[in-house]
From Swiss-Prot:
Highest classification ranks of the organism: Eukaryota, Fungi, Dikarya, Ascomycota, Pezizomycotina
GO molecular function terms listed in the Swiss-Prot or TrEMBL record: glycosyltransferase activity
Temperature dependence as stated in the record: Optimum temperature is 35 degrees Celsius.
Location of region: Disordered: 1-26
pH dependence remark: Optimum pH is 5.5.
Top-level EC class: transferase
Name of protein: O-glycosyltransferase PaGT
Pathway in which this enzyme or protein is active: Mycotoxin biosynthesis
The organism of origin for this protein: Phomopsis amygdali
Homology family: Belongs to the afumC glycosyltransferase family.
Keyword RNA-binding assigned: no
EC number from the UniProt entry: 2.4.1.-
Pfam families reported for this sequence: Caps_synth (PF05704)
Length: 406
């Protein structure tokens, strides 16, 4: 499709030349994603995970992944790993057992977040062993990641890792794990995964991880419960301990950020400052959220607006989509903690009765999908510095608790 002539591409974008558009059919791309492709020396790997396999993914997430492959072209190998023994992309075909917790090796993980934490346990080893990009399947790429990869691959640059940051506490940002790009064999990735493995131990679920001595120094969360995890009255609907349990992998990196390893002198703060290319999540991943009061219902309303809708409905939808096409890197639609969001577009699109509304012909959802492939942003991504907490670094061994500050 091409959008109606009355829709003008936004300032800050330029048309992608037809010669640069991927000519493959969706079916051809799906076959390439579903096949087992052994890693090579190339680090241009796009990694994702869906516990029950490609065929069982919600259709809108399949379209997301096909779209990644089309945007990146054949230079990148896109894989969606799964938890099905014997499948072409079973995670153990790529991640050796010693890098997985016993609960995963023995298939005894339990609780509502088995799929989420299974993905957590493969994302870091995949980047460490093979390099490339990790992205959750609930994300629509708005612009190519190639320019970020070019920075990481440039021998004149010090960067080896890229990710988003989010302000979890006043004056303190965390590096989050939805989108990450890393060079093979990066030390930070190894230490991060080792810390998460140690934290998890032989547990079968995340319950109680907030009590672990390695995380006992963390200050209470604040802004994480603003907007994304609040009700319609902006009141928190999830307790801090449950949030830390769920997102424990992220908080393991908070620990490494403040660690100087007494065994070998490795300095987490220095490593992050020198080797990580960081972008603000509220600018480059959740840019759409405050624009819609964090309401999935409002996002759904805008994207299902038809081109011939009356004003101001039509104008609002066009303005919203054009803003996304020009000003953000991707749009990640979250499920997150169970019952922790008053309205989630991911939940709406998961509902079979809304199948196809993420790309319905004649709607601004269709225009969003079209624009991400046919328009190219002209802005340059500029890295931000991680906002670390005030106070000294902790000189301890890798798995030694930080001294109490009480």
């Amino acid at each position: 499709m091409s959008p109606p002539s009355q829709i003008k591409p936004p300032q800050g974008t330029t048309p992608v030349p037809p010669s640069e558009l991927d000519p493959r059919s969706d079916e051809e791309i799906v076959r390439s994603i579903s096949a087992h492709v052994k890693p090579t020396d190339s680090e241009k790997n796009m990694w994702a995970y869906w516990h029950s396999g490609w065929e069982n993914m919600p259709p809108w997430t399949k379209r997301n992944v096909v779209h990644w492959a089309r945007m990146l072209g054949t230079e990148w190998t896109v894989r969606v790993l799964d938890g099905i023994p014997g499948s072409a992309n079973y995670y153990e075909r790529f991640v050796p057992p010693h890098l997985l917790p016993s609960a995963m090796r023995e298939r005894r993980m339990s609780g509502p977040y088995v799929a989420t934490h299974s993905a957590d346990f493969v994302r870091l080893p995949l980047l460490f062993l093979y390099g490339g990009c990790w992205l959750d399947v609930g994300a629509i790429l708005v612009r190519s990641i190639q320019d970020v990869w070019d920075v990481l691959a440039d021998p004149k640059q010090s960067y080896e890792f890229a990710a988003f940051t989010y302000m979890m506490r006043p004056g303190e940002a965390s590096i989050i794990n939805t989108w990450m790009m890393g060079r093979k064999n990066m030390e930070l990735l190894r230490r991060w995964h080792d810390t998460f493995l140690h934290l998890w131990g032989d547990k079968s679920s995340c319950d109680g991880l907030h009590k672990h001595p390695l995380l006992s120094h963390l200050r209470p969360l604040s802004s994480l419960t603003h907007g994304l995890i609040t009700d319609e009255n902006n009141e928190p609907v999830a307790k801090t301990d449950k949030i830390i349990d769920y997102g424990a992998q992220v908080y393991c990196l908070d620990r490494l950020r403040d660690l100087v390893d007494t065994n070998d002198g490795w300095n987490g703060r220095q490593c992050i400052e020198e080797k990580t290319f960081l972008l603000a999540a509220l600018d480059e991943m959740w840019y759409y959220q405050p624009k819609t009061d964090y309401l999935g219902s409002r996002q759904f309303e805008l994207l299902t607006t038809r081109y011939d809708a009356p004003e101001p409905q039509r104008g609002d939808a066009e303005e919203f989509v054009n803003d996304m096409l020009a000003n953000t890197m991707l749009m990640k639609f979250c499920h997150g903690l169970k019952d922790a969001m008053v309205s989630s577009l991911a939940d709406i699109w998961d509902d079979p009765k809304h199948d196809g509304t993420d790309c319905a012909p004649g709607t601004f959802a269709e225009y969003l999908r079209w624009g991400t492939l046919h328009l190219r942003q002209t802005r340059t991504l500029e890295p931000v510095k991680l906002t670390a907490p005030a106070g000294k670094l902790h000189h301890v061994a890798m798995f030694e608790p930080f001294p109490s500050t009480n």
